[in-house]
Amino acid sequence: MFHAIQVLLLCVFTAMLGLGIVSPIMPLYAESLGATFIQIGLLSSAWSISRLIFTPVIGRLSETRSKRKLMAVGLAVYMVVSILYTLAWDFTSLFSMRFLHGLGSAITIPLALAYAAALAPEGKEGRYMGTMNLSIFSGMGLGPLIGGYLTDEFSLSAPFYVMSAMTALSLLLTLIILPEEKSRSSIVRRSAPSFRKVLSNKLFRAAFVYRVMDAFGRGSVMYFLSIFISGSSEIGGLGMAVSVAGLILSVGQISMAAMQRPFGVLADRYNKVRLILLGGLLAATGYALLPNAYTVWEVMMARLVISTGAALAMPALTAIVTIEGRELGLGTTMSVFQSAMSIGMIAGPLLSGLLVDLIGLQRIFYVGGLIGLTGTVAFYFMERLR
């Protein structure tokens, strides 16, 4: 079990590192190809649209097929598309490659989480899923820092080559070390449940709605955060270096990662619902602080408030999904839960791309906070009425 968890952590870390590496440069890359703000939002949504389409299908398939082999396919897609990014010649080609990137994510991340959830002992779901979330946020946190540095020191293409090399390493270790799931007695195969059955579970449905709204709010602002930090004052930006944007994004994600395991232990000991509600309120407050930040430290502090809220809520939320998934089917449950994020990440950037053109860059952060607050309130009432 120990070696399996290690490999799963590495797979998730590498996949999310690749995503994090390109996050501070993708809007700039698209802008260099002549993309508008709305197209930049659409580019972010391409990744999530792909995940929304393929994640539930892969989740159901994983109930009766080898998760190890499917994960290897997903990592291979990641590796290839990383190189293809450097060959983009216009917005349409970049959009297509972003869509393929989402396919790799749809295969890799939910299956790694489902595999880890199946290995989690009862009563330690928060600890195990907090550890997996640590890997996710560590990759996303270090990625922008590396991506910003490589862009400033080398070129816009350099981060994509690094992303491909890291994914190739993860793929190799998956094939060599990760055991076949069917060889483990602790993992039971079952027929794939329907999506309707999964969503008919009231507690899971409340978690699903919270995740949709959380991703909606996050997607509305986070994709434009690098533009807010490094963009010119004419568009409402702060005019800082790309590496500074990468640093702020990284500190936010790394701090979130560092809090995942202790907050996971907290989720195993205390009321998970209350932790989710408190986390949602904190994150919404952080979004509202961003447009009032003018220095590096002020932006950093607002980002840390968002990170603390997200870190508090996520282990408790994924622990609930794990517990309910044992009865429903972990592969399908994790995939549907991941689809919730995709729905929000599709709508969020599209809405923000439109609103930035209408109301300005800075006001979009208030919109993101309001959306996150709405999701928190919706979760509270849905959980009470179940």
Where do the model's predicted regions map?
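Residue-level signature of mid-helix packing/kink "hotspots" within the transmembrane helices
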Residues: 48-56, 140-141, 253-261, 345-346
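C-terminal membrane-cytosol helix-exit motif in multi-pass small-molecule transporters
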Residues: 165-184, 375-383
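Cytoplasmic helix-loop-helix junction between adjacent transmembrane helices
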Residues: 97-136
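Juxtamembrane intracellular "pre-TM" segments in multi-pass secondary transporters
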Residues: 1, 179-209
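Short amphipathic helix-loop junctions that connect adjacent transmembrane helices
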Residues: 25-37, 223-243
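Paired small-residue
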Residues: 81, 92-100, 286, 297-305
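Conserved MFS/SLC helix-loop-helix module at the cytosolic interface between two early adjacent transmembrane helices
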Residues: 53-89, 267-273
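Intracellular juxtamembrane helix-capping segments at the cytosolic ends
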Residues: 108-120, 312-325
